[in-house]
């Protein structure tokens, strides 16, 4: 399951399976 969320420009927020795939900004996933 996704371990992090990232904001990708106009794409908005996207959850990625690895931190390496989080660009350009790394954000923690909401606990909920």
Swiss-Prot record:
* Residues with PTM Serine amide: 32
Show the disulfide pairing.
none
User: In terms of domain of life, where is this protein from?
Assistant: Eukaryota
GO terms of molecular function: toxin activity
| PTM statement from Swiss-Prot or TrEMBL | Contains 4 disulfide bonds.
Its principal location? Answer: secreted
Its localization reads: Secreted
Q: Name one GO cellular component term.
A: extracellular region
| Tissue expression profile of the protein | Expressed by the venom duct.
Does the record's keyword annotation contain Calcium? no
List 4-hydroxyproline occurrences by residue: 2, 24, 28, 30
Which controlled-vocabulary keywords does the entry list? Amidation, Disulfide bond, Hydroxylation, Neurotoxin, Secreted, Toxin
- UniProt domain comment: The cysteine framework is XXIX (CCC-C-CC-C-C).
Protein's name in the database: Conotoxin Cltx-4
Organism for this UniProt entry: Californiconus californicus
